[in-house]
């Protein structure tokens, strides 16, 4: 069993923002597998998919980005999921829009959602997919990440969401190191 968490902020006003690209990826997986989202007792929305016989628990924390770890750790404990079977999907300002990067470990890189997860799971050694949203050319980062993707960037971000979902489906049956080699 694997736990796949897409990071984002709950609520309609954040739905299509750069900061919610993690939610968009797990939504894509739920859509592909036609599975509903249900509210969990651990302050998140969960959906269960089955890929080649491997159960994957998709989760969208409802804690807001900066407290994502408060949802992830209890779900890991409840389902008895080991850290090597966890994968976190989130936005990355340091990658161009539409680029994805898979890693097995690393720092939070200034991402508050990842800081929270690292704090709660007590390690930096877990799988992740970083989805590029680029940095703003001007203005504050907070306004940028909480803004929607402009029309010109939508084809690139849709492609990145699809590619990320493909990589996650591969992770159901393939060691993450091999998935990294295929998608990086």
Curated annotation (Swiss-Prot):
Positions annotated as active site in the UniProt record: 19
Source superkingdom: Bacteria
EC number, UniProt record: 3.1.1.29
PROSITE patterns referenced in this protein's UniProt entry, alphabetically: PEPT_TRNA_HYDROL_1, PEPT_TRNA_HYDROL_2
Oligomer status and interactors: Monomer.
Family, per entry: Belongs to the PTH family.
Functional note: Hydrolyzes ribosome-free peptidyl-tRNAs (with 1 or more amino acids incorporated), which drop off the ribosome during protein synthesis, or as a result of ribosome stalling.
Protein name: Peptidyl-tRNA hydrolase
């Amino acid at each position: 069993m694997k736990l796949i968490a897409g990071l984002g902020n709950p609520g309609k006003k954040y739905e299509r923002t750069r900061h919610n690209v993690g939610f968009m990826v797990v939504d894509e997986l739920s859509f592909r597998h036609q599975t509903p989202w249900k509210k969990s007792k651990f302050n998140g929305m969960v959906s269960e998919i089955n890929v080649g016989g491997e159960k994957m628990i998709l989760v969208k924390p409802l804690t807001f980005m900066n407290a994502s770890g408060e949802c992830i750790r209890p779900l890991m404990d409840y389902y008895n999921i080991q850290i090597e079977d966890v994968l976190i999907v989130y936005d990355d300002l340091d990658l161009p829009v539409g680029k994805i990067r898979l890693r097995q470990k690393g720092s939070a890189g200034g991402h508050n959602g990842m800081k929270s997860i690292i704090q709660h799971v007590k390690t930096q050694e877990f799988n992740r997919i970083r989805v590029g949203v680029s940095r703003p050319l001007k203005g504050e980062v907070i306004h940028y990440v909480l803004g929607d993707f402009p029309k010109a960037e939508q084809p690139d971000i849709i492609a990145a969401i699809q590619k990320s979902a493909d990589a996650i489906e591969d992770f159901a049956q393939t060691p993450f190191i091999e998935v990294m080699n295929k998608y990086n």
